[in-house]
Swiss-Prot record:
The keyword Secreted belongs to this UniProt entry's keyword annotation: yes
Organism: Mus musculus
Lineage: Eukaryota, Metazoa, Chordata, Craniata, Vertebrata
Superkingdom of the source species: Eukaryota
Glycosylation sites (chain numbering): 168, 222
Entry PTM: N-glycosylated.
Subunit structure: Forms monomers and predominantly dimers.
Gene, per the UniProt record: Cer1
Main localization, broad class: secreted
Protein name, as recorded: Cerberus
GO cellular component: extracellular region; extracellular space
């Protein structure tokens, strides 16, 4: 009797285990097709939903109107606000504000492109000032020479200097071919001084950056008229500050500075 009870106690858990194995296998076999069917249904539903809803991150400007574009922008802004800072960073990087973009464009228009090694390139305000100086004191012949840029350094505009600046001088005459001559102009600023006194005893000295060494060249132009046309051109080689007093006396200022000289004007003196 006791032996029979022991056998029943041993066989009872084994029977439950067999039933559980069969039931679990049948349940697993049933749940796997259900899972695959659910996945297919979910994929189809997501695909249909994706076809119905437009992509918020793709815009076709030529296919949408202003109202649709504005609605897309609003939806995109809402979505980005929900996603948080992770999506806002690329938004600010790829779409900068208008004021930042305008500042970048304006600075790019005004500044010269810097080289790759990081060295600063000299900007051109002084070249523009030199060009205005050129128009005001050198030519005054209209807009024909507006594109001329002189190789003048920035510090030379503010300090006292006097030197030769190379440029291409165009010699022109009516019914004649233009001739371009390599020449130099005197550029700089020179000092001025006035000694105190009364009446005739007061003396004023103004120094000018003038040529101290130059040659005069007679240039014959090729013209259609039978009368030959000859132009006199002053080719400047060296420049220094020349002092001119109120009485018309002109002499070299050894410890002086700078002024301006117009090439081509007739000179009263020729200094070798």
């Amino acid at each position: 009797m006791h032996l029979l009870l022991v056998q029943l106690l041993v066989l009872l858990p084994l029977g439950k285990a067999d039933l559980c194995v069969d039931g679990c296998q049948s349940q697993g076999s049933l749940s796997f097709p259900l899972l695959e069917r659910g996945r297919r249904d979910l994929h189809v539903a997501n695909h249909e939903e994706a076809e119905d809803k437009p992509d918020l991150f793709v815009a076709v400007p030529h296919l949408m109107g202003t109202s649709l574009a504005g609605e897309g922008q609003r939806q995109r802004g809402k979505m980005l606000s929900r996603l948080g800072r992770f999506w806002k960073k690329p938004e600010t990087e790829f779409y900068p504000p208008r004021d930042v973009e305008s500042d970048h464009v304006s600075s790019g228009m005004q500044a010269v492109t810097q080289p790759a090694d990081g060295r600063k390139v000299e900007r051109s305000p002084l070249q523009e000032e030199a060009k205005r100086f050129w128009h005001r004191f050198m030519f005054r012949k209209g807009p024909a020479f507006q594109g001329v840029i002189l190789p003048i350094k920035s510090h030379e505009v503010h300090w006292e200097t006097c030197r030769t600046v190379p440029f291409n001088q165009t010699i022109a005459h009516e019914d004649c071919q233009k001739v371009v001559v390599q020449n130099n102009l005197c550029f700089g600023k020179c000092s001025s001084i006035r000694f105190p006194g009364e009446g005739a005893d007061a003396h004023s000295f103004c120094s000018h950056c003038s040529p101290t060494k130059f040659t005069t060249v007679h240039l014959m132009l090729n013209c259609t008229s039978p009368t030959p046309v000859v132009k006199m051109v002053m080719q400047v080689e060296e420049c220094q500050c020349m002092v001119k007093t109120e009485r018309g006396e002109e002499r070299l200022l050894l410890a002086g500075s700078q002024g301006s000289f117009i090439p081509g004007l007739p000179a009263s003196k020729t200094n070798p």
